Amino acid sequence: IARLAQEEGAQVVLTGFGRGLSLTTRIAGRLPKPAPIIELDVTNQEHLDGLVTEVKKHLPHLDGVVHSIGFAPEAALGGNFLNTAWEDVATAVQVSAYSLKSLTMACHPLFKDGASVVGLDFDAQVAWPKYDWMGVAKAALESTSRYLARDLGKDNVRINLIAAGPIRTIAAKS
């Protein structure tokens, strides 16, 4: 997505956290143009509160945001649905669904008129084998996007999800 955006003339700022930060750095190295990277933990309110300041170091405003964030602890995947502890479920839902709202609202002050938020999704209508609480989190992501679209439409902010089909992720390996 970042490469295509740059090829269309967009300036891109990337975020990452934890193990994902090193992956983001590797991906940034393959882009046609250098892209700044901001460390962002969507479960850390201080990171979210400081996001506008960090982005403004590179861009005056945002035309759009891509939400490509998802995580579920190993205990929330792999066929242990009935025995998963709430802490693991809460982590999956916070990182994979609530973060769409958190990220969108953290970026809202930077949105230019007509801004767009696009999130990456996977089919939450099917109880996929071993996907377990990540499937529930994806269903929550879909619902979250509808409520954000309802509430931010008045600000001319569009919220959409796209499902690219199965992608090799940690959750897919379960």
What kind of feature is each model-predicted range?
Residues 1, 70-109, 113-154, 165-169:
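Catalytic loop of short-chain dehydrogenase/reductase
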Residues 1-87, 174:
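Short-chain dehydrogenase/reductase
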Residues 11, 61, 116, 158-160:
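Structural signature of beta-strand start/N-cap positions in the alpha/beta core
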Residues 15, 43, 104, 145, ...:
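Ser/Thr-centric signal marking residues that sit
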Residues 17, 42, 122, 164, ...:
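Active-site loop/turn elements of alpha/beta-hydrolase fold enzymes
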Residues 37, 162-163:
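Low-complexity, Gly/Pro
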Residues 66, 118, 159-162, 172:
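Hydrophobic structural elements of the Rossmann-like NAD(P)H-binding subdomain
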